[in-house]
Regions:
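A common structural junction motif
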Residues: 138-147, 241-248, 355-364, 456-460
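Short conserved segment of the HATPase_c
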Residues: 167
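His/Glu-rich zincin catalytic helix
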Residues: 1-108, 121-126, 132, 136, ...
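Histidine-acidic residue clusters that define the catalytic metal-binding segment
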Residues: 15-40, 180-220, 250-256, 381, ...
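M16 family metallopeptidases and their MPP-like homologs
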Residues: 51, 56-86, 95-142, 156, ...
Length: 467
């Protein structure tokens, strides 16, 4: 015991960026950066999370707004279109001048819109001569976009072309139908980018009104990581916050109601059939997340060796990949299982997947499966804060979902302490094999029986998966 404690102390005392020997690593997780998260609020009400990281002369800034498609109201696609238009124009600069402005400083601007959130991000060198002009331009783009009319037409056309492309993609069609069935009239039901009908009618006035409301400082979380002092970080956060519209945080959407279980088929002329199975999962505040995350890792969250992959691909050759995932969101996000298989084997494959889920819920994981999943988690966990980019993403999520600052460490400790019974209980509390909403997309063809399981399946998945 004392020996182990001494070894642990010597490892802990050594800086995290020094090399570890292979002997030291044997059976243990690699060392990971301990995050010293500093936090405060700006005068306008934005929440700020900051980690000082001096290794490289650069910094990452990520501003997260509760401005995703769940805030679209009756206008699907409004949030996505607003976000896409941010860097299309500011006073005195069009989209090309903005891009050249960032590029000339060696800076990267990024933006994105999802169901819960919209994001604007900046990566820049930290020297004052590069940092200050990059931040000035970023503050204008995020806080004072001009929404030029010609750009709106161009981006609408790009989105409309995307919708046309989606019609040729059975996976996209199935995914859209699945969210519609799973969420009904809830704001999560419609696609983040809206539809051809809704996008066409969106006006500049609607974009400006949405930006003024949803891109307000009170509705923002500012995450900063990099080569900055606390004083510099405070100045950056104050500058960004002051440049945003004034206003409060927007309310989260209501919790969704449980959907009606059942199967919907979309007829599509393809060789393969897409199978999507889902039910409502959890929100990001749910205390069962560590148990569900580990339980899902064993079911279908990893690559080879999961219950689903072993039975469906390795023993029967029915698919290239079958995956399950919980997506916790502001309110209950989906639990999903996705795969593609030969059209003539689709009904049998669907039943097999349902049986695997039912059996897993009934029996729970084995001790060996749980131990392996814990070891895999411990090995991959350091990657969650190995780079500034990954840290700034974690900070953004912690701030946006109002998680404890120790959330990453807590998650790891709670996961490693879980028992087989706790994982089984959590999976059964949140999932039920007979409550699945199922969407399939593919041709109607005569069905064949599934091959028997074997170590060397004679069936091979068809070609490259269709997307």
């Amino acid at each position: 015991m004392a020996d182990n404690a001494a070894k642990a102390d010597s490892t802990a005392a050594r800086p995290a960026n020094t090399l570890q020997s292979l002997a030291e690593l044997d059976g243990k997780a690699p060392s990971r950066r301990q995050l010293n998260i500093q936090h405060w609020n700006t005068a306008e009400g934005a929440r700020v999370l900051f980690v000082e990281a001096r290794e490289l002369p650069m910094f990452d800034l990520r501003v997260t707004f509760a401005a995703g498609s769940s805030q679209d109201g009756g206008t699907p696609g409004l949030a996505a279109l607003t976000n896409a238009m941010l860097n299309e124009g500011v006073a005195g600069k069009d989209v090309t001048a903005i891009a050249e402005g960032f590029e000339g400083l060696g800076a990267d601007f990024g933006n994105g819109s999802y169901r819960d959130m919209a994001v604007a991000s900046l990566r820049s060198l930290s020297t004052k001569d590069k940092r200050e002009p990059a931040l000035k331009l970023f503050a204008e783009v995020a806080g004072k976009p001009t929404f030029p009319e010609d750009a709106l037409k161009r981006i609408k056309n790009q989105m409309l072309a995307g919708f046309e492309y989606d019609k040729q993609n059975p996976g996209k069609l199935a995914g859209k139908a699945l969210f519609g069935k799973l969420y009904g009239d809830h704001p999560y039901a419609h696609p983040s980018d809206g539809s051809a009908e809704s996008i066409n009618g969106i006006t500049l006035a609607q974009l400006r009104a949405f930006h003024a409301k949803a891109y307000s400082a009170g509705n923002a979380v500012i995450a900063l990581v990099g080569d900055l002092s606390r004083a510099e970080a405070e100045a950056i956060a104050a500058q960004v916050s002051a440049g945003l519209p004034k206003g409060p945080a927007l309310a989260a959407p209501a919790q969704p109601t449980d959907p009606k279980a059942g199967l919907t088929h979309i007829d599509f002329p393809s060789k393969q059939t897409h199978l999507m199975l889902a039910e409502l999962g959890i929100d990001r505040q749910d205390p069962d997340w560590p148990a569900l995350s580990l339980g899902n890792q064993i079911l279908g969250g990893g690559a080879f060796g999961t219950r689903l992959m072993s039975e469906v691909r390795e023993k029967r050759g029915l698919t290239y990949g079958v995956y399950s995932v919980f997506s916790p969101m502001q309110v209950r996000g989906p639990f999903m299982i996705n795969l593609q298989t030969r059209a003539e084997l689709s009904e049998g494959t669907l039943k097999l997947v349902q049986d695997i889920l039912a059996d897993y819920l009934k029996s729970g994981p084995t001790q060996q499966e749980l131990d392996d999943a814990k070891r895999e988690l411990a090995g991959s966990f350091p990657l969650s804060n190995a780079s500034n980019a990954s840290i700034v993403g974690q900070l953004g999520a912690i701030g946006f979902y109002n998680l404890p600052l120790t959330w990453l460490e807590d998650f790891m400790q709670q996961s490693q302490a879980l028992t087989v019974e706790q994982v089984k209980a959590a999976m059964n509390k949140h999932l039920s094999a007979d409550k699945l909403v199922i969407v399939t997309a593919g041709p109607k063809v005569p069905q064949k029986p599934l091959p028997a399981p074997t170590d060397k399946p004679s069936e091979h998945p068809l070609g490259v998966p269709e997307h």
